[in-house]
């Protein structure tokens, strides 16, 4: 075969290192095996990058898609159980393919279908969850791989502040109607009190090193349980009543959601090392405000464990002054 010129290997006009060069929007089918269950087939979006030294005009971008295809073909005979593991293998293959690179990065996003039942009528349904994984590999005699896996889940929250304002107004109105204090307190404890709601988007990403793996289903469950209520694609009338009631009996600020995720992550992932980095994020899309509410915590597992271990020394804060 006639040897063609390698323009990418030429010297650039300005010899400057580039942090990331690669391709985005690469769609591939990924099959993930599950122990004792049918495998999951994901339509996944990949982004792959390498760093570029100042001596090269460009990167050989075709090698990026070749690296993805090679790893996916190899995994047909060797099942993949974790998406972050797959990204890690692709990142290492990129370093093999790009001999001039010292760092490779792979990002993968997919829509994952989870099976659920409606809360009251128990009808089987399917819900879509966004999942993602990343891997960063560095070259050397003993290549180092850092992996991230996570998910974003939609739920609903009910505002505690507005609810307390409405509760106080209801208390005054009921007193004016002649009800006793005891009857009013019993009523307000039993009946969901009106407030405004938000569509919440909670996300968790966990960074682990080398061969540690994190089950994605556990992450999804934690996010779902860290808001006022889950939401569903299908709701019959009894389900709708139950979801609304649950949400208003469990009001949460955006900050509450992140703190709830934090304590659930610590309780669930006892096997993770203290240096595993966790990013917890909540965005609540407001219904009566023009802005959205945001909260985030980035910490190592050891830091979260230490904070929760000291919680018994803390006294609950008093009631807010309205």
Curated annotation (Swiss-Prot):
Pathway: Cofactor biosynthesis; 5,6,7,8-tetrahydromethanopterin biosynthesis. It comes from the Archaea. Keywords: Hydrolase, Iron, Metal-binding. Its EC number is 3.5.4.39. The record marks 159 as: May be catalytically important. Pfam families: GCHY-1. Binds 1 Fe(2+) ion per subunit. GO terms for biological process: tetrahydromethanopterin biosynthetic process. Signal peptide: none annotated. It is an enzyme of class 3 (hydrolase). The keyword Metal-binding applies. One of its GO terms (molecular function) is iron ion binding. It catalyses: GTP + H2O = 7,8-dihydroneopterin 2',3'-cyclic phosphate + formate + diphosphate + H(+). Its cofactor is Fe(2+). Belongs to the GTP cyclohydrolase IV family. Converts GTP to 7,8-dihydro-D-neopterin 2',3'-cyclic phosphate, the first intermediate in the biosynthesis of coenzyme methanopterin. Homodimer. This is GTP cyclohydrolase MptA. It comes from Methanothrix thermoacetophila (strain DSM 6194 / JCM 14653 / NBRC 101360 / PT). The gene is mptA.
């Amino acid at each position: 075969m006639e040897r063609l010129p390698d323009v990418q290997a030429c010297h650039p006009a300005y010899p400057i290192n580039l942090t990331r060069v690669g391709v985005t929007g690469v769609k591939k089918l990924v099959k993930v095996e599950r122990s004792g269950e049918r495998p999951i087939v994901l339509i996944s979006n990949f982004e792959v990058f390498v760093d570029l030294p100042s001596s090269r005009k460009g990167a050989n971008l075709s090698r990026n898609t070749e690296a993805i295809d090679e790893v996916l073909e190899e995994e047909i005979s060797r099942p993949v159980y974790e998406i972050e593991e797959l990204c890690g293998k692709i990142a290492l293959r990129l370093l093999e393919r790009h001999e001039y690179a010292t760092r490779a990065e792979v990002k993968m996003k997919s829509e994952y279908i989870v099976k659920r039942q409606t809360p009251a009528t128990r009808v089987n349904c399917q819900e879509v969850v966004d999942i993602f994984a990343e891997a960063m590999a560095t070259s050397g005699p003993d290549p180092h791989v850092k992996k991230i896996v996570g998910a974003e889940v939609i739920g609903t929250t009910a505002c505690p502040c507005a609810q307390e304002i409405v509760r106080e107004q209801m208390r005054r109105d009921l007193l004016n109607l002649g009800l006793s204090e005891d009857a009013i307190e019993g009523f307000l404890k039993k009946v969901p009190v009106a407030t405004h709601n938000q569509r919440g988007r909670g996300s968790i990403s966990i960074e682990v090193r080398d061969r540690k793996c994190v089950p994605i289903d556990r992450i999804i469950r934690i996010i779902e349980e860290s808001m006022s209520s889950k939401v569903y694609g299908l709701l019959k009338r009894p389900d709708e009543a139950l979801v609304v009631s649950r949400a208003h009996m469990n009001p949460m600020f955006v900050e509450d959601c992140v703190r709830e995720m934090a304590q659930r992550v610590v309780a669930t992932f006892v096997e993770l090392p203290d240096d595993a980095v966790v990013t917890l994020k909540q965005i609540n899309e407001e219904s009566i405000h023009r802005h959205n509410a945001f909260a985030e915590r980035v910490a190592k597992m050891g830091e979260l464990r230490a904070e929760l271990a000291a919680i018994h020394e803390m006294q609950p804060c008093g009631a807010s002054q309205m």
